[in-house]
């Protein structure tokens, strides 16, 4: 990269090697047509390592349910529910033109933010937010300064509660014509609400970007991940959130069965927390539990400033709920990739399920 050895602070953290690019939006609208802020399809051109890149994006229209709701709480404890218009959202997935194996997951809300794969390499892109608003940084994850070098792990072990496990994600694939849908509720606990200084717009953007990333990975299993609701515990936690992931998961499952399931139609609920779980654990979920009111849940620690890493942890715990166990030994997710169901989150880019691509 041209800026090797120089560092810059981005939302994703301190990046040491990066390239400044200027994405140019290519419009295909006929002359005189009214341009929407976030069109159904968009195309951007820029250069990476001196080579031209054409990024083709399509709006992720299946991101939200038709009756999507957002919930927060007033200081006196009243639940406040809104149904915002989300059709005009700014979350996209796509590919690089003339690269059949390429993928992209991009937020276009404030410049471009997300990641794309080209010629087997994954790059992240993020707006520099300078007075020159078109300037973006392109970088690899390996060039993000690590906050903590310790390995982070899923808390599911061989003796963790399970019904009938599906050994590999590939066993979930019935046929390419059989599309399935999973409606999920994301609950943001009070520690995470406080971490983002009560900025609900920032929290929503963080969560939506994660779900957009997850939906790309689950697409290869012919499962659409749809957000039914986002609930923020803005005043206080509605359960006892502990450093024990197991205790927190149990409490969250009981709360879902007693409360959440009776007011929001959904298949699965995930708790996002800024609480630092004991040991290396960053997530936990019941295995093969999708149809159980108390057990179709997971808990995920907001453990990184790199959205992609938290998103993959979330995708991992949802897969446990579906009945998928950890991958053992070697994993065929392509050169340079660790599979989503690896029990350890490390410094490699994590993208696919075993044998799903």
From Swiss-Prot:
GO terms for biological process: proteolysis. Residues 1-6 form the signal peptide. Disulfide bonds join 333-339. GO terms for cellular component: extracellular region; plasma membrane. The lineage of its organism: Eukaryota, Metazoa, Chordata, Craniata, Vertebrata. Keywords: Disulfide bond, Hemostasis impairing toxin, Hydrolase, Metal-binding, Metalloprotease, Protease, Secreted, Signal, Toxin, Zinc, Zymogen. Binds 1 zinc ion per subunit. Belongs to the venom metalloproteinase (M12B) family. P-I subfamily. Snake venom metalloproteinase that impairs hemostasis in the envenomed animal. Its EC number is 3.4.24.-. This is Snake venom metalloproteinase H4. Expressed by the venom gland. Monomer. Its main location: secreted. Zn(2+) binds at residues 316, 320, 326. It is found in: Secreted. Its cofactor is Zn(2+). GO terms for molecular function: metal ion binding; metalloendopeptidase activity; toxin activity.
């Amino acid at each position: 990269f041209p800026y090797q050895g120089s560092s810059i602070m981005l939302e994703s953290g301190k990046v040491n090697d990066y390239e400044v690019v200027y994405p140019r939006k290519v419009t295909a609208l006929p002359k005189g047509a009214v341009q929407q802020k976030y069109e159904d399809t968009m195309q951007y051109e820029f250069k990476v390592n001196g080579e031209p890149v054409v990024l083709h994006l399509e709006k992720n229209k299946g991101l939200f349910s038709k009756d999507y709701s957002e919930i927060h709480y007033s200081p006196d404890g009243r639940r406040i529910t809104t149904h915002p218009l989300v059709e005009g959202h700014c979350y996209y997935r796509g590919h690089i033109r003339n690269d059949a194996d390429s993928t992209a997951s991009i937020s276009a809300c404030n410049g471009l933010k997300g990641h794309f794969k080209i010629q087997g390499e994954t790059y992240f892109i993020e707006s520099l937010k300078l007075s020159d608003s078109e300037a973006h940084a392109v970088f690899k994850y390996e060039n993000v300064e690590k906050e903590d070098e310790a390995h982070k792990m899923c808390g599911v072990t061989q003796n963790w509660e399970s019904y009938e496990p599906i050994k590999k994600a590939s066993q979930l694939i019935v046929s390419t014509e059989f599309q399935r849908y999973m409606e999920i509720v994301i609950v943001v606990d009070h520690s995470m609400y406080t971490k983002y200084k009560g900025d609900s717009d920032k929290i929503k953007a963080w969560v939506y970007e994660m779900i957009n990333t997850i939906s790309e990975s689950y697409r290869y299993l012919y499962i659409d991940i749809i957000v039914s609701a986002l609930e923020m515990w803005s005043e206080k936690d509605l359960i006892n959130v502990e450093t024990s992931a197991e205790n927190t998961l149990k409490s969250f499952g009981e709360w879902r069965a007693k409360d959440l399931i009776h007011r929001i139609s959904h298949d699965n609920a995930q708790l996002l927390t800024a609480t630092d779980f004991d040991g290396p654990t960053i997530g936990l979920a019941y295995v093969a539990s999708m149809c159980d009111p108390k057990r179709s849940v997971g808990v995920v620690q907001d453990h990184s400033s790199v959205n992609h890493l938290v998103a993959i942890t979330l995708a991992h715990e949802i897969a446990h709920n579906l009945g998928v166990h950890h991958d053992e030994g070697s994993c065929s997710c392509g050169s340079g990739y660790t599979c989503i169901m690896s029990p350890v989150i490390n410094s490699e880019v994590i993208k696919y399920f075993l044998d799903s691509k």
